[in-house]
Amino acid sequence: MFAVIKTGGKQYRVVANQVVRVEKIIGNAGDVVEFNDILMAGQEDNAIIGAPVVRDALVTAEIIEQARARKVIAFKKRRRQNSKRTRGHRQEVTTLRILEILTGGLKPKKAVAKSIKEEAAVLKATTQETKSAASVKKAAKKSAPQKQAAVASNSKED
């Protein structure tokens, strides 16, 4: 059985026990994630095509590692100007092992932690809580009281 999943703005054709590298997914090595955006699923001769997604379809995968892809070099040179610029970029990627592909509303065999969208929502909520806790500032202190000697010297002038 195969499935076409959508993650990170890309589409991947996956089968059970396949290892695939996708855009970064939140989670640690060993975590189990599930994909709900299944565009197509089925056998070679009998496929279900979603409009836009297949109902009651689920793909579970295990995170093998979080890594960074090879460096991509962006080099610009302006001729006769003695000007050039070199920049590098390394994309963060996640290596996954596809555990099972389920259709027809079947439940996964292994206990699945959370779906990717739920994890992202939880992460966003926790970051907002920490930002709000960090943004609470104490009021500035009033100016320091005058020293006794300065007050005494002012009263002598009178």
Swiss-Prot record:
Residues 131-158 have a biased composition (Low complexity). Pfam families: Ribosomal_L21p. It comes from the Bacteria. The keyword Ribonucleoprotein applies. One of its GO terms (molecular function) is rRNA binding. One of its GO terms (cellular component) is ribosome. Residues 127-158 are annotated as: Disordered. Keywords: Ribonucleoprotein, Ribosomal protein, RNA-binding, rRNA-binding. Transmembrane segments: none annotated. Part of the 50S ribosomal subunit. Contacts protein L20. This protein binds to 23S rRNA in the presence of protein L20. This is Large ribosomal subunit protein bL21. It comes from Bartonella henselae (strain ATCC 49882 / DSM 28221 / CCUG 30454 / Houston 1). The lineage of its organism: Bacteria, Pseudomonadati, Pseudomonadota, Alphaproteobacteria, Hyphomicrobiales.
